[in-house]
Amino acid sequence: MFVWIDRRAFLLLHGESLVLHGGAQGLRDEGLLDSALSRPVNLAAYGSPDVFDCAAAHAFGLAKNHPFIDGNKRAGFLGAGMFLRLNGHRLTATQKDATLTMLALAASEVTEADYAAWLRTHTAPA
């Protein structure tokens, strides 16, 4: 059983990220956000994913769906990190490594499964 990301809390986190790091505020498509946040829930309902598979599904869905005007890759990374934290894990990767890996996921240079494997090796218990 997983603790899922609350949509409103995620919107606040994304907004805070834009304030801190720059970018245009706004949601481009609510349906795409809902789809991205539902992706890991559906994965868990119809499969046997671990916490890292679900975190990767958050990252992939948010980065690929582009629900926001700006900061979609950042949103994907934040979604993965938030989900991991809610479920007892914390990221341990360097900022550079995390950025390069997230960019590779968004560019389809690594798969969602590859990203889940990367998360497994770059986390620790919270």
Listing of model-derived features with the role each one plays in the protein:
Residues 1-126:
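FIC/Doc superfamily catalytic core
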